[in-house]
Regions:
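Conserved, aromatic- and glycine-enriched, well-ordered alpha/beta core segments
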Residues: 48-53, 64-68
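Short helix/loop segments within enzyme catalytic domains
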Residues: 74-82
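Divalent metal-dependent phosphate-bond-processing catalytic cores, especially two-metal-ion Mg2+/Mn2+ enzymes
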Residues: 2-35, 44, 48, 54-55, ...
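Conserved catalytic core of two-metal-ion nucleotidyltransferases
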Residues: 82-89
Length: 201
């Protein structure tokens, strides 16, 4: 089973857990999500991780496309664009404005407790990829504090998570009302190789 599938089934993007944190994040940022189309986006935005060989690499970055296509089919192109732009890296690389779904999605990560997030990410194998990619991204970004940079370079997953959550919370506070994203550095995605029989991560 590929890592993207595992993530959606029982990992960091678990389809029965993550959407609830996303809904809670949306409520904190923008009020209660009364629009049923928002709830559809909450459940569909990460559907494209199914069958992906990696999470943040060449394959994983395209995960936004499936949910966007479904949302566009159901509710129109504007909702497809809204869903696709939930990834700030995808949005920046494609010259798009990140959506409010992106901001709420980042806050959802912050709201997910470490005691839940870390075991899920470890169980699927995502954690090692996330830790590596976070180091690559902070190396080219001036918006990490010294403490956050030290935490992101720590081999301890708990410390790493504290650093990433601190940075992500500040990104949310800075961008909750939209505007240009000068924080996100688009490091070229790369295939993330693992020795698991060639299934990818």
């Amino acid at each position: 089973m590929r890592i993207g599938t595992k993530s959606v089934l029982y990992g960091a993007h678990c389809a029965v857990i993550h959407p609830w944190f996303l809904a809670a994040a949306w409520r904190k940022l923008y009020g209660f999500p009364w629009d049923i189309r928002l709830w559809c986006a909450f459940w569909l935005h990460d559907a494209g991780y199914f069958s992906k060989r990696d999470m943040d690499g060449l394959d994983g970055e395209t995960h936004v496309e499936l949910g966007a296509r479904i949302m566009a089919f159901l509710f129109g192109e504007s909702w497809g664009a809204f869903t696709a732009a939930h990834s700030r890296y995808w949005a920046k690389r494609n010259g798009r404005q990140f959506s409010r779904l992106c901001v709420a999605d980042k806050l959802a990560f912050v709201l997910t407790p470490a005691w839940l997030y870390l075991p899920m990410a470890r169980a699927t194998g995502e954690l090692s990829e996330y830790m590596l990619r976070a180091k690559e991204r902070q190396a080219g970004c001036e918006h990490f504090t010294a403490i956050e940079s030290a935490q992101l370079n720590s081999p301890d997953a708990g410390e790493w998570l504290k650093g990433l959550k601190s940075y992500t919370r500040r990104w949310v506070e800075e961008h909750r009302d939209g505007g240009a994203d000068h924080w996100t550095v688009t490091v070229p995605p790369a295939a993330f190789q693992v020795a698991d029989g060639g299934s990818g991560r």
